[in-house]
């Protein structure tokens, strides 16, 4: 009985511990993206060489500009996109378009403190296919990535080509962020963990 009581006490003690969890943090998106790039065709085929870039995605001597003009390696551009997709502060509405209910095809719907909050379904926002929106108006969709790829392989000036290719890789990081969110329970169950519009901590902060 004493042994059983001690065992139960240990279980309670361990399960009561609180630890920092990065389940919904930007760093998690970057880690997942880094692994994805590491196991992608960019590492194992001639895809980059065929684009005129016969080097490793992590080569620090081979960089391209991101959307801020900072020179980054190819893998760093993916990581920038994965991080930037969550927006720049609580007034950025990009995160509200990261939800997708596979049962009904809807995006985010609901209210926060009486304010209606909604968003486009994540696949529609990320791909931007057959969208009435002006190309580039939402920024960093797969359609934008294709446009950047075209500019990066056709512009006569080297600087313009580098800018196009840099934005292409960063934009693919934005799209990968959506794929990751659609494999995360809150984003498919309409669970508003958003810090919108600056009304308090999201669920991830409470869990952490």
Segments the model singles out, each with a brief description of its role:
Residues 1-7:
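Positively charged n-region of N-terminal signal peptides that target proteins for export
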Residues 7-16:
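Bacterial N-terminal signal peptides
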Residues 20-174, 178-181, 185-208:
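N-terminal, motif-rich segments that launch catalysis or mediate targeting to/interaction with membranes
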